[in-house]
Structures are given as structure tokens and as C-alpha cells.
């Protein structure tokens, strides 16, 4: 078994003002505190303003000496030209018309959100380049587990996460990615490969960063942007030999690969009334009809 160095990061992009999945900075810090007692070495990328708070949280568990905080003044200056192109795509009406969910406020349709998702893989690469992460690494989202959504007991994270996975980029997926068309995923915003965790050896951090960056560059050539799930799918398509894909579910890879003791929140099947079921079905029918109309109108414009 090999100890994992965890790389994570948090940058305030105004999620508290998002129309969907709105979360404040304090909420994210609370999410981090829930799992921050993990005994592994952690490298955290964040802004100078938040760096002391991150170190304070790890210090609460006596783990300041196993924590490195990298202050990034402006994360959008890491790849400024690429971000500028992404921001231009966000403003294109036809990009939104192409997507099954055309709402410009949907996170996946926003340039700043998608750029931050790309930065996960830059952080992994940069941590290796700086000599801060060696051996087996894992990207773990700063807000992992959403403060107890899947794993119920924060005390369970007081352990050393280790792995016996081999030297490949290990991705975790909701379904078989070989049965998913990457173009349809881009259009329908369907979910397959999960953006976290990603477990890999330090020797492949550079490859993963270059692949995901290349994927985003390819998307903007098509006047599109998308989040980490799409970038990983495209990277997997480009170099499948360096990846190993494991079927799993949200947050579950940590339990399945080294954290078997983590207690789960009991799942309660949501029961809807007959009227609620009808309303939900009508909502999706309406959304699909609107999508079909947008594509039909686009086909007429392009004289298809």
C-alpha cells in the first residue's frame, strides 16, 4: 500500500451568486473542515486571502505540518489566453442553443466555472513540478462530500488514506465511457466520468494536464466550453492506454479504494405524490421540446 498525497484547491468565483448550486465561501470552508482531519499530506491551492483559513482548519487537527498552501494571486492568469477565448464562447448565443440545457446561468455553461474545473489538473501538475507531491497523488475536491452528504461521520476521516492501485490515471465513472458518445455528452450535458477523485502517479501529472488543456483548446475551436467531466472523457479518448476506469458512484471511490470504514448516510428513497410525478414528467417533456425546437430552428438557419 502506498500513501497518497492529496492535492485540492479553492478559488472564489462567486458561487454564492450562482442561480444553480449556489454556495458561499464559508460553506466551502465548512465542507473542507469535514474531511480536513485526514492524516495525509495535503497541498492546497487558493488565494492569499483564504490561505490562513485553510491552514487554521488543518491546524485544528494538529496537521499544519502536513499541509502546504500555495497562494495563487490570480488563477485566471495561469492560462489567460485560453480563459479569454472561453469567455468569448460563453457569450455566443449559438453555444447555448446547441446545449440541451441552454440556460446561461447553468454552471457548465459558464467560462469561469469550467476554467476552474480545468485548473484541477494544473494544480496536480504544478504540485509535482514544485516537488510538493511525489508518488501516488489524488485530486480531491475542496468541497468533497458536501459536509456529510454521503459520509456521515467527520471523525471517520481521521485516518491515513493509502492505495494499492497501479501507475495509471485512475478515473471513476457512473457508467461505461466506451458506451458514451463524447459529442452527445457535450450537447446533452450527461454525466459519466467523475471529476473527483482522480488518482494517479506523479509521473503522469504532466500528461493529464496537457491532455485536459488540449481538450479545452479543442472545445473552444468548436465554440464550446464544458467542465471536467467532458475534459476527462476527451482525454480518455485521446490516450486510453494511460487510464484505468472504475465504475462507481458520487464520492464512493474513497470508500471503495482505501476507506472501507467510512460510514454512509442511509439512503432514503424519495417518494413523490402522483401530482408531483406528473409535474416532473411534464417539465422534462417541455425541456426536450424546447431543445428540439432550438435544433430545428438552427437546422433551418444552416439550411439543413
Locate the predicted segments by residue.
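Active-site-proximal specificity loops/subdomain of glycosyltransferases
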Residues: 61-130
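N-proximal low-complexity "stem/linker" segments adjacent to membrane-targeting elements
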Residues: 1-27
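Short beta-strand-to-loop element that shapes/binds the nucleotide-sugar donor at the catalytic cleft/hinge
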Residues: 167-182
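Non-transmembrane, aqueous-exposed alpha-helical and coiled segments at domain scale
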Residues: 122, 162, 173-177, 230-232
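GT-A fold catalytic core of metal-dependent nucleotide-sugar glycosyltransferases
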Residues: 112, 116-170
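Membrane-proximal basic amphipathic "stem/tether" segments
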Residues: 258-304
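Catalytic core and acceptor-binding pocket of nucleotide-sugar-dependent glycosyltransferases
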Residues: 146-150, 186-272
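Well-ordered, non-membrane alpha-helical segments in soluble/globular domains
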Residues: 21-32, 152-158, 230
Amino acid at each position: 500500500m502506498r500513501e497518497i498525497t492529496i492535492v485540492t484547491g479553492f478559488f472564489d468565483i462567486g458561487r454564492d451568486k450562482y442561480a444553480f448550486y449556489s454556495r458561499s465561501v464559508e460553506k466551502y470552508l465548512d465542507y473542507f473542515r469535514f474531511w480536513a482531519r485526514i492524516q495525509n499530506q495535503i497541498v492546497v491551492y487558493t488565494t492569499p486571502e483564504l490561505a490562513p483559513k485553510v491552514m487554521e482548519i488543518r491546524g485544528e487537527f494538529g496537521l499544519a505540518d502536513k499541509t502546504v498552501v500555495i497562494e495563487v494571486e490570480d488563477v485566471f492568469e495561469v492560462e489567460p489566453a485560453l480563459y479569454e477565448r472561453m469567455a468569448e464562447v460563453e457569450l455566443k448565443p449559438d453555444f447555448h442553443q446547441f446545449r440541451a440545457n441552454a440556460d446561461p446561468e447553468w454552471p457548465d455553461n459558464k467560462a469561469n466555472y469550467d476554467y476552474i474545473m480545468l485548473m484541477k489538473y494544473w494544480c496536480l501538475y504544478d504540485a509535482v513540478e514544485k516537488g510538493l507531491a511525489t508518488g501516488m497523488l489524488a485530486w480531491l475536491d475542496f468541497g468533497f462530500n458536501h459536509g456529510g452528504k454521503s459520509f456521515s461521520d467527520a471523525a471517520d476521516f481521521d485516518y491515513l488514506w493509502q492505495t494499492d492501485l497501479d501507475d495509471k490515471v485512475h478515473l471513476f465513472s457512473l457508467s461505461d465511457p466506451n458506451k458514451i458518445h463524447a459529442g452527445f455528452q457535450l450537447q446533452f450535458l450527461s454525466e459519466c466520468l467523475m471529476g473527483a477523485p482522480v488518482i494517479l502517479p506523479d509521473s503522469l501529472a504532466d500528461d493529464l494536464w496537457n491532455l485536459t488543456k488540449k481538450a479545452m483548446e479543442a472545445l473552444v475551436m468548436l465554440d464550446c466550453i464544458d467542465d471536467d467531466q467532458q475534459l476527462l472523457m476527451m482525454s480518455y479518448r485521446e490516450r486510453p492506454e494511460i487510464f484505468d476506469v472504475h465504475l462507481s458512484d458520487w464520492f464512493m471511490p474513497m470508500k471503495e479504494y482505501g476507506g472501507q470504514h467510512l460510514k454512509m448516510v442511509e439512503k432514503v428513497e424519495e417518494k413523490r405524490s402522483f401530482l408531483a410525478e406528473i409535474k416532473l414528467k411534464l417539465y422534462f417533456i417541455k425541456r426536450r421540446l424546447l431543445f428540439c425546437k432550438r435544433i430545428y430552428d438552427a437546422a433551418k438557419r444552416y439550411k439543413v
